[in-house]
């Protein structure tokens, strides 16, 4: 199902004029070529040999000023003119991550410079532990459509937007909140009319945290431990709603 969803995403975005460098997670996409690493093609699957030839794992984890190409792709998508945050406040994160098929993916995020070093360290610790993260693409790949990227189980950080089902800005709008493995760790809230708002809408089954399934975040999970030890709070502990994918900086 997730592979089908990704094919649909790719088709939609190609029709929208957004070029996906190579975001397929199949083994056919695996390569020992250094080009994907040199060009930092997020979503590409690479071999350990390619990583070694590129310069090693250390070279693949870094925080840098937003590159021109990334900044251009963010315009009108994750970034909109606003009084709260600008380009100089943000950093582009390069990282590697493992999936459940034991393959290495190239990943990237944009975050606030305040959390950049901490986020790089956490992602490196997750990589070293072979913690599975299915996708780590910029939300701009999905035209900053939060529902679409969450259905695709994408992990991300910065997006200038409001809180789901609310009118105030999300911590994602400042780049100080990170969502991990979003399909399996949904957001849900009981609305004033008694109805249940779930995001992504396809994740209703994963609101039940009493059963085990891949990518599940709970108090025993390494992702929870690393983020909370680094000064983040987990949305799964909130009382008025639950946001199991969400870690935000405690201010």
What are these language model-derived features?
Residues 29-103:
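N-terminal module-boundary/linker segments of secreted carbohydrate-active enzymes
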């Amino acid at each position: 199902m997730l592979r089908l969803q990704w094919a649909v995403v790719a088709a939609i975005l190609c029709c929208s004029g957004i070029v996906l460098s190579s975001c397929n997670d199949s083994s056919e996409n695996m390569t020992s070529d250094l080009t994907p690493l040199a060009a930092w093609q997020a979503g590409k699957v690479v071999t350990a040999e390619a990583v070694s030839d590129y310069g090693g794992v250390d070279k693949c984890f870094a925080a840098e000023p937003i590159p021109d190409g990334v900044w251009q792709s963010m315009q009108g998508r994750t970034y909109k003119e606003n009084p709260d945050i600008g380009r100089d406040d943000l950093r582009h994160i390069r990282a590697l991550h493992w999936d459940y098929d034991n393959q290495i993916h190239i990943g990237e995020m944009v975050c606030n410079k305040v959390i950049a070093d901490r986020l790089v360290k956490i992602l490196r610790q997750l990589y070293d532990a072979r913690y599975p993260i299915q996708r780590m693409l910029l939300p701009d790949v999905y035209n900053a459509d939060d529902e679409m990227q969450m259905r695709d189980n994408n992990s991300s950080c910065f997006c200038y937007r409001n809180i789901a089902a609310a009118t105030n800005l999300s911590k994602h709008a400042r780049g100080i909140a990170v969502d991990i493995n979003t399909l399996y760790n949904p957001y849900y809230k009981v609305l004033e009319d008694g109805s249940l708002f779930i995001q992504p809408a396809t994740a209703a089954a994963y609101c039940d945290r009493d059963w085990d399934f891949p990518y599940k975040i709970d108090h025993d999970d390494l992702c929870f431990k690393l983020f909370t030890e680094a000064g983040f709070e987990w949305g799964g502990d909130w009382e008025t709603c639950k946001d199991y994918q969400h870690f935000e900086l405690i201010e």
